[in-house]
């Protein structure tokens, strides 16, 4: 499966941007000394149970420009729970034509353990200093589950 990801936050940023009404706006500057370990955004034309598009974390060596689209393939999903309920984040890599290194990865099980630890650590801590907010990391799931979640979110989008 290949989909496009819309990048809101570049790798290495501590500024949380959100795309709203056709514009990229600053949502907030992260409260703690944290920065996004990889590029973060959403998969267009998807809808999660929380009413937002499906979140995606795109693993690359380089930060991508906010507002850009990149063709990716899902390799897994990070399941978290926050103050609003279950929050799933698709973990994706660019397709091989775009990134010949990460493009070879097919499943989250192929990611180096250090990459998964970095992702887990970030999402466990990035809301820690924000009043009334929290995140609990539940588990990583593989490519098949990620693809099921994307297909369901695409169906949800079509039904709205």
From Swiss-Prot:
<keyword id="KW-0460">Magnesium</keyword>
<dbReference type="InterPro" id="IPR036649">
    <property type="entry name" value="Pyrophosphatase_sf"/>
</dbReference>
<dbReference type="InterPro" id="IPR008162">
    <property type="entry name" value="Pyrophosphatase"/>
</dbReference>
<protein>
    <recommendedName>
        <fullName>Inorganic pyrophosphatase</fullName>
        <ecNumber>3.6.1.1</ecNumber>
    </recommendedName>
</protein>
<feature type="binding site">
    <location>
        <position position="16"/>
    </location>
    <ligand>
        <name>substrate</name>
    </ligand>
</feature>
<feature type="binding site">
    <location>
        <position position="28"/>
    </location>
    <ligand>
        <name>substrate</name>
    </ligand>
</feature>
<keyword id="KW-0479">Metal-binding</keyword>
<comment type="function">
    <text>Catalyzes the hydrolysis of inorganic pyrophosphate (PPi) forming two phosphate ions.</text>
</comment>
<keyword id="KW-0378">Hydrolase</keyword>
<dbReference type="GO" id="GO:0005737">
    <property type="term" value="C:cytoplasm"/>
</dbReference>
<comment type="subunit">
    <text>Homohexamer.</text>
</comment>
<dbReference type="GO" id="GO:0000287">
    <property type="term" value="F:magnesium ion binding"/>
</dbReference>
<feature type="binding site">
    <location>
        <position position="55"/>
    </location>
    <ligand>
        <name>Mg(2+) 1</name>
    </ligand>
</feature>
<feature type="binding site">
    <location>
        <position position="50"/>
    </location>
    <ligand>
        <name>Mg(2+) 1</name>
    </ligand>
</feature>
<feature type="binding site">
    <location>
        <position position="126"/>
    </location>
    <ligand>
        <name>substrate</name>
    </ligand>
</feature>
<feature type="binding site">
    <location>
        <position position="87"/>
    </location>
    <ligand>
        <name>Mg(2+) 1</name>
    </ligand>
</feature>
<keyword id="KW-0963">Cytoplasm</keyword>
<dbReference type="GO" id="GO:0006796">
    <property type="term" value="P:phosphate-containing compound metabolic process"/>
</dbReference>
<feature type="binding site">
    <location>
        <position position="40"/>
    </location>
    <ligand>
        <name>substrate</name>
    </ligand>
</feature>
<comment type="similarity">
    <text>Belongs to the PPase family.</text>
</comment>
<dbReference type="GO" id="GO:0004427">
    <property type="term" value="F:inorganic diphosphate phosphatase activity"/>
</dbReference>
<feature type="binding site">
    <location>
        <position position="55"/>
    </location>
    <ligand>
        <name>Mg(2+) 2</name>
    </ligand>
</feature>
<dbReference type="Pfam" id="PF00719">
    <property type="entry name" value="Pyrophosphatase"/>
</dbReference>
């Amino acid at each position: 499966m290949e989909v496009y990801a819309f990048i809101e936050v570049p790798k290495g940023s501590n500024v949380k941007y959100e795309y709203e009404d056709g514009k990229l706006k600053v949502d907030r500057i992260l409260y703690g000394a944290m920065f996004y370990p990889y590029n973060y955004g959403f998969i267009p034309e998807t809808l999660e149970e929380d009413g937002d598009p499906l979140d995606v974390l795109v693993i690359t060596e380089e930060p991508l420009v906010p507002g850009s689209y990149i063709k990716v393939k899902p390799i897994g999903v990070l399941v978290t729970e926050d103050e609003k309920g279950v929050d799933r984040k698709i973990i994706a890599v660019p397709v091989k034509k775009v990134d010949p290194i990460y493009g070879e990865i097919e499943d989250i099980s192929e990611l180096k353990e250090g990459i998964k630890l970095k992702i887990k650590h970030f999402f466990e801590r990035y809301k820690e200093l924000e009043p009334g907010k929290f995140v609990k990391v539940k588990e990583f799931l593989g490519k098949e589950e990620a693809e099921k979640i994307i297909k369901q979110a695409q169906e949800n989008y079509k039904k709205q």
